[in-house]
């Protein structure tokens, strides 16, 4: 038996960021990285759309590349204080991965990081909040997956978090965001996308649903100049 899990809703195409207005809730916390979303005006747009949806909004900013356990704990503490019913992660893989881990800790304050790392052994989420991921790069695809990577810098180890529970409820893939990437990042994330597509096709966990997507992704990346 196999399982193929994707976000409930995947909004894509230019201008799809506007679909934040369709979310229903009272409070949203927006998790972002180093500042590109703010510099390019997308963070302000996201906040405005969430407020238009009737939500109070708070920011958790400056998630570093390869997010740390410490950042996860700080973000979870901010969520516990604010009590959002939507977690909106915006940017590349790092802020989205960090927000997934924060989400677990927010829903289960007593859980340890070691317990969070138990593969496909997480408790049920969505008791307090739902999750929306907005990607700004082409590579990680964490906006549609059941995975995240968090770094313990004291041990010098990157830990994968893996469970269908951390698959986002909503994903927004708006090319307006990706078009602001520097040329070097376009190249790096393009290789990342190609690698993930090849991995998916040769994986022992592949299935009839994943193979066509993987093959099409390989062709699309290889034909893009």
What are these regions (language model features)?
Residues 1-86:
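ATP/NTP phosphate-donor binding region
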Residues 75, 98-103, 197-198, 218-221:
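Buried hydrophobic packing segments
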Residues 88-100, 136-140:
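FAD-binding core of FAD-dependent oxidoreductases
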Residues 95-108, 144:
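Short Gly/Thr/Asp-enriched flexible loops that form oxyanion-binding sites at enzyme active sites
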Residues 224-225:
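Conserved small/polar residues in nucleotide/adenosyl-binding loops
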Residues 15, 37, 41, 45, ...:
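Conserved active-site and cofactor/substrate-binding residues in soluble primary-metabolism enzymes
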Residues 108-208:
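A glycine/threonine-rich phosphate-anchoring loop and its flanking beta-alpha core
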């Amino acid at each position: 038996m196999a399982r193929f899990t994707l976000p409930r809703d995947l909004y894509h195409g230019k201008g799809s960021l506007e679909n934040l207005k369709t979310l229903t809730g009272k409070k949203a916390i927006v998790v972002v990285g180093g500042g590109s979303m703010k510099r390019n005006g997308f963070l302000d747009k996201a906040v405005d759309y969430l407020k238009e949806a009737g939500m109070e909004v708070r920011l958790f900013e400056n998630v570093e590349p390869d997010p740390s356990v410490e950042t996860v704990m700080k973000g979870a503490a901010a969520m516990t204080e604010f009590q959002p019913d939507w977690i909106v992660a915006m940017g590349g893989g790092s802020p989205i991965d960090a927000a997934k881990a924060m989400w677990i800790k927010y829903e289960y304050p007593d859980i340890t990081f070691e317990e969070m790392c138990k593969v496909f052994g997480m408790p049920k989420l969505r008791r307090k909040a739902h999750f929306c991921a907005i990607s700004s790069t082409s590579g990680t695809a964490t906006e549609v997956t059941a995975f995240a990577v968090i770094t313990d810098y004291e041990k010098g180890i990157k830990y994968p978090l893996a469970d269908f529970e951390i698959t986002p409820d909503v994903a927004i893939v708006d090319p307006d965001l990706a078009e602001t990437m520097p040329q070097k990042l376009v190249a790096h994330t393009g290789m990342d996308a190609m690698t993930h597509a090849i991995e998916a096709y040769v994986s022992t966990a592949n299935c009839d649903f994943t193979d066509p997507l993987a093959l099409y992704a390989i062709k699309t990346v290889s034909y893009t100049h």
